[in-house]
């Protein structure tokens, strides 16, 4: 069957840069799924994305679906005809659905009976008839939170669409996509190359766009060019460019023909904290800052133009003029803010609402101050420094710098606290209170910072859950999922001895009578345990391992971590599967039993050698493991418990648990409950699959 290259390009106005990659990848994935669902064989599927286009190219696409044989079994003959041999309604309905009459149906005869049968040879449809519809379906499934209309059209898309190119080999596939009839016309760069030209063959893409349109459609190529040229530009001035992945992606999504240039700013601005300068360079202007080999910010920046200019110095000068007022603003704010102490901003926090039912930022500050001190006492941090950090924690939100450059919250608090002569761990805590901000982010570096970060996040969790505003679906306006995971990461990775039960109770207590949810403590803990599940799945632990530990509801995060790792190791042992099955059997036996168990096993009632052996083994292990459990050495405990495999197997092979004699039966059930209790001190391994 003939195979050809297929190309679809959607020409648009400027697409959202932060969404460009996801749009392109989703388009390719959706279209591939459509091809596979339609049984159209194909080779490699490539995606292309630039500010004004999304494209997918498919190699070796079959010209038509393969023919296929269809079989549909109908009602059994007994139900297909009545006593007089007339077709039943069920048979007629089935036949109608197949496009035949009952008389035209074949018979399927097996050892189990006889049925009506429809067989047909279905000829595959040409790809030309299917592709436009498949493109429309793939586009309709893109992750676009907000669609827009343009002109007088009813069509909706992320941005207005101007061209649609659908080519199978050299032929245009007729069809309408997003209100535009397909053609072979594509658009080039706005200011370079040909504004508009025709493409003869799908195989010419994306090379023809590069040569005639001056557009690099290959997203990864464009990104790699920017990275390479920016690194070289930084080296030429003796520095290292800050090529953060997120900004690199965004800049690659803003330009069609990247040209990397280097500019500078006045050295006097380096007196301003680097974070503020970097914020305006990266956040506002999409520039790459440059650092020297010691990690200090240099008075240079690298930017990417979207055009090859005959006079690049003009572009450089223009960008230097644009950034100077922003840096001057930062300098002014920094000087102005330092004219008063950070603590002097406390009264102004009363004018800012944290949440209508939960009070102002000043109220939140008081709670954080108290909770940070409480946490510090639990983890051995300096209580006075923790409460001081709590008091100052939100003061920088009232400064000019943070008001103008919002992403500098925390870090400016640190700089202003240092200027005021605060203790260093207090100053650092003000910066690190929001950590970790995202998956993989650094954790607070000192105990005071840990106490403040935990207090800030727990106050938010307790408050928002306390008024019943739980996260729903993908809506989480107070970032409670991030806060919960942040608390858990700090406690686990810093190995802090904190219990979620008492921690949550203290956070709730500090709200007084403001909270309306009577189950707030349980709700917060369950929510946080749910975050544990997601976190440990991402770490590679199996779902049933996590469920086995969650069944014990351990509220100490560090303890939870030790249990999960212990069970994961236990599963590698030869005895694991047999003991998990035995625990499941014991669990089922105990669940079905209506007998009241004894407090302990009565040795005098034990008769069978296998039950005597198990009882003795359990007594020995219980005494050995008591200090092991107390120390939280769960891995070592499970290794010891694995030695029970042979004894447990012998018990089930030779002992009738549900004996007729009541005393014997209850004693054996009690023995099994003691076996299960030992394992339950780590996890419910009966849940392991």
Curated annotation (Swiss-Prot):
Subcellular location: Cytoplasm
Record-listed E.C. numbers: 6.1.1.14
Main location: cytoplasm
Pfam annotation, one family: tRNA_synt_2f
GO BP terms: arginyl-tRNA aminoacylation; glycyl-tRNA aminoacylation
GO MF annotation terms: arginine-tRNA ligase activity; ATP binding; glycine-tRNA ligase activity
A single GO cellular-component term on record: cytosol
Domain of life, per lineage: Bacteria
Catalytic activity: tRNA(Gly) + glycine + ATP = glycyl-tRNA(Gly) + AMP + diphosphate
Keywords for this protein: Aminoacyl-tRNA synthetase, ATP-binding, Cytoplasm, Ligase, Nucleotide-binding, Protein biosynthesis
PANTHER family, A to Z: GLYCINE--TRNA LIGASE, CHLOROPLASTIC_MITOCHONDRIAL 2, GLYCYL-TRNA SYNTHETASE
NCBIfam families for this protein: glyS
UniProt similarity note: Belongs to the class-II aminoacyl-tRNA synthetase family.
Subunit relationships: Tetramer of two alpha and two beta subunits.
Protein name, per record: Glycine--tRNA ligase beta subunit
